[in-house]
Amino acid sequence: MNVKDIMTEEVICAEVPGSSDQALNLIITHNVTGLPVIKKGTKELMGIISKTDFSRNPSEGQLALLMTKSVITTTADTDVKDAVKTLLVAGIKRLPVVDGENNIMGIVTSEDLVWKVVSKLDTDEKVTSYMMKSFTAVWKDTPLKVASEIMRLSGSRALLVLDSNAKLYGVLTDTDMLRVA
């Protein structure tokens, strides 16, 4: 199976020149964790922007200064197993699919792989073999600004929220944090 068999072809992209507010609005509106950034009026890939980029420099208004310019990409003919290895080794969640001229053709995300590949595997393996065994937690009355800093410092995309009895009260995600912005 190749990347072209599972990639999303209708890619939501931010454009440069553009503002970080426009990109953040796209991320929130489309409920995604990041976007490829293309040159305005073309399909040429210029960078990628993720929720993490916003937390690193929340006051930056220019998308070109906030986005990651060195983007790891793949091609449509790449084997899915190789794309998975790339995502895991690089520690990234999305892999833009480009043609020979660096024009965006699609995107493969970790979610695509879960829904289109892993869910179809014929396996009886248990989740305990793959689950995270450590996590970061905060108390339910922790100020949002403090929780944001804890999330940034821990590298977590989600925090377990505990009540005064140390019982699970909820989960706070980086997407929840963006809704405040």
Residue ranges and their predicted role:
Residues 1-181:
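Tandem CBS (Cystathionine beta-synthase) repeat/Bateman regulatory domains
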